[in-house]
From Swiss-Prot:
GO cellular component: cytoplasm; proteasome core complex, alpha-subunit complex
Keywords of the record: Cytoplasm, Proteasome
Location(s) in or outside the cell: Cytoplasm
Origin species: Parafrankia sp. (strain EAN1pec)
Protein name: Proteasome subunit alpha
Signal peptide: none
Length: 241
């Protein structure tokens, strides 16, 4: 049977869409999400002070993303509406990261299957529990695939190098400053060389940092900026040789 000109099998279409999405995501700077003694820490390489990769979603839930900003921003705002509606109609305790992750998985899966162009995004939805054992971190990819991660995850460009560093240095129950240093060192390991082909140095001005702190009252999400971020970085800065 002769195939019409320009025909591509379903398998080829899936491969092409996947390659397209992965290339777009790989161009984005990485984001790390990891647990620390009092909650969950979000760290992104992001020099912009207005275009956030990390956001608060609900009482105990945070969001991080890489890829095309307008696409993951659309998902973020839609997620907030979903959770606000669910909390209003039922109970705030019914709003969970798992429910949000499932909604995102359905949306991304439908877009990947039905649209010519998939979303070029990778997302993390995290929820801080009342204890460390209750913390939840979900990773979602462009095709709607969802994974339940434990301890840490990295998304975006060079994520494999970043994950290798996290596996070596992250441990459960680390203090906030130590977890931040682990995240920054991991992002540095995944960053391309600097102008002189040397190791890049990530400073507070290159970072977007936030946390979900289970010890806080009411709003558990807090951005770490300014002198607080500088102090945490200085606390674990490598000694000059």
């Amino acid at each position: 049977m002769t195939m019409p000109f320009g025909y591509a099998s379903p398998e080829q279409q899936v491969r092409d869409k996947s390659e397209y999405a992965r290339k777009g995501i790989a161009r984005g700077r990485s984001v790390v999400v990891l647990t620390y003694v009092d909650g969950i820490l979000f760290v992104a390489e992001n020099p912009s002070t207005t275009l956030h990769k990390i956001s608060e979603m609900y009482d105990r839930i945070g969001f991080a993303a890489v890829g095309k900003y307008n696409e993951f921003e659309n998902l973020r705002t839609a997620g907030i509406r979903i959770m606000d509606t669910r909390g209003y109609m039922y109970d705030r305790r019914d709003v969970t990261s798992r429910a949000l992750a499932n909604a995102y998985a359905q949306t991304l899966g439908a877009i990947f299957t039905e649209s010519i162009k998939p979303y070029e995004v990778e997302i993390v939805v995290a929820e801080v529990g009342h204890t460390a054992a209750d913390d939840q971190i979900f990773r979602l990819t462009y095709d709607g695939s969802i994974a339940d991660e434990r301890g840490f995850i990295a998304i975006g460009g060079q994520s494999e190098q970043v994950l290798t560093s996290l596996r070596e240095h992250h441990t459960e129950g680390q203090p906030l400053a130590t977890a931040l240093r682990v995240a920054v060192d991991a992002l540095t390991a995944g960053a391309p060389p600097g102008a002189q082909n040397g190791e890049r140095t990530l400073t507070a001005g290159n970072l977007e940092v936030a946390m979900l702190d289970r010890k806080r009252s009411r709003r558990l999400f807090k951005r770490i900026v300014g002198s607080q971020l500088d102090g945490l970085l200085e606390e674990t800065a490598p000694s000059a040789s």
